[in-house]
């Protein structure tokens, strides 16, 4: 990635990816002061020259260990894949290409993929690819309540009495 790629990156994340959010756009990531992070973001192109994935990332040093990690300027990152790349083969291919690149320049990798709640399309293929390639995964509990068609009263009624005060 270079700053000249910002418009292509942001268009891809917001309009062509299945698991991208505004948190992975350059517009958001560039909010942080220049020099705060050593950007290591990648753009992965397919065999036809089309953009298949972006990986917002930065270099983190732990002593002498060079770690390629999800961009610290965002809550989560990980590979952001084209919305049509929802097969295990495509996900493994993208992640393997990223891993091959990382192996030549870094000692370790640390990804924080987009939680399922925020994915525009189901992304179990990417989760499978991480497991298939031997990554360990940290799981965080996230809870959501569908609110479509519900009034504030019926929504509050669905919470236990002792939790209602935390919601108001």
Which sequence ranges carry the predicted segments?
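Generic beta-strand structural signal
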Residues: 77, 107-109, 139-143
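Acyltransferase donor/substrate-recognition loop-hinge adjacent to the catalytic core
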Residues: 1-6, 124-168
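Conserved donor-binding loop and adjoining core beta-sheet/short helix segment
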Residues: 11-14, 27-100
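Conserved GNAT acetyl-CoA-binding A-motif
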Residues: 104-115
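Short, charge-rich binding segments
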Residues: 99-104, 133-136
